[in-house]
Amino acid sequence: MANLEVNFCGVKIKNPIVASSAEPTLNAHNMKKCIDTGVGGVIAKTMTDSEAMRELTTRSKWRFLNERHEVCQGKVPRCFSLYGRSGLALEPPEEFLPQIVETVEYAKDYDAVVIGSIASTALEGWVELA
């Protein structure tokens, strides 16, 4: 079998397939399912200390965009992109972080990496989350 390993910013990843921060990485259960498929890694849903930012997830927006990146009206054309903005982790950091830790432990058995994602509205929040 071919060696698909990549080195990204000093992090060795067994293959270049990474499940990014979206619904597939919304919780530990989903991240583990991604890892089970053989991905090289997962990027956990962004966690934040801001309740207002977490509420964005409840107002997710999905759109079909045509080749000119315009929102499709009516029939979806043959060439299109599915664009989504789904927000952040629903739980506050103290509830979401244990799910990331659980996923990191699970990922070790599959030689997969788990990458965290954080957001805050203040410098102090960024420092505390990091």
Predicted regions and their residues:
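Active-site entrance/lid segments in N-terminal catalytic domains of soluble metabolic enzymes
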Residues: 2-13, 18-130
